[in-house]
Amino acid sequence: TAASLQLSMLGGSGHIEGTNKNGRLSYLIGARHKTSKYLFNAMDTKADYTPKFSDLQAFINYELNTDWQISFLGNISKNEYTMIPENRDTDFGTINEALKLRIYFEGQEVDKYETYFGALSTTYQPSTELNLQFTTSAFQTFEQENFDILGEYWLYQLENNLGSDEFGDVAFDRGVGKYINHARNSLNARVLNFSHKGNYNKEAIKVDWGFRMQKEEIEDKISEWNLIDSAFFNFPHPVDSIGNPTSNPNQQIVMSELLKTQINLSSYRNSGYMQVSK
């Protein structure tokens, strides 16, 4: 039996492996956890970044007898990303027309990604001429992307006179506005698989065969929209109406971008082969 453990400011990892007394059972299990919070904090946008990554892997093999063995391979992975933005400053333009964009944020983004995988395989060799293998596996992935981000931005003209004591500072405002980014996206996919392989080799004849059956199910939903408004021009407001100041017909908020999709996909795949050689 052997084991290891590593720890750091960004996470840690560990594993254990070994066999039982008679050597029939062997195993290898490992786990990891990592956060990149310190790395993301160096980005231009000032925000509270909290990314987390965790996974667990395992491989177990057991020999029932000299002719028959069973093995299992599994993996679990969970990733989570949370961002709460605060503000951002961006300088751009030329020396003759230097600009600064300052944005103050409200809201947050929360993304989750989960993956599960498991495979069970058995190998049976009743004789030196015949070898049989059966494998069944399952795969599941789930993803979520959710965010509501409100940004209030100011566009500044910077002082471009090289001889001025205020060179590079804000000279005046060129415009203000707001924007909203919204998303509720999800993906759910499942894959089930069963396969068989075999070969028979005796004297001058060799036969190989196999087949595979697989089922796939995918559910994909996307719901995103983006609204950009300058001085609330896109928001509903009372219209001018001489003689009837209370007139206010129905008005709509016009989105800058809108995307809504939903896909449900189910498929079956079957395949097989046989080869005879001398």
Question: What label would you give each PLM region?
Answer:
Residues T1, K34-A42, G93-I103, G168-Y179, ...:
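Flexible, solvent-exposed coil segments and beta strand-coil junctions
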Residues A2-Q6:
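Short catalytic-loop micro-motif centered on adjacent basic/acidic residues
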Residues S8-H33, K46-P85, V110-L132:
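Transmembrane beta-barrel wall of Gram-negative outer-membrane proteins
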Residues H15-E17, S26, L39-N41, T82-I84, ...:
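Short acidic, gly/pro-rich beta-turn/loop elements at beta-sheet edges
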Residues G30-R32, S54, N96-E97, Q157-N161, ...:
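Short alpha-helical linear motifs
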Residues R32, F92-E97, T135-E143:
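Short, highly charged low-complexity linear segments
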Residues E63, D67-K78, Q108-K278:
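Face-selective signature of the C-terminal outer-membrane beta-barrel domain
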Residues E86-T94, G151, N226:
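Short, flexible, mixed-charge acidic loops at enzyme active sites
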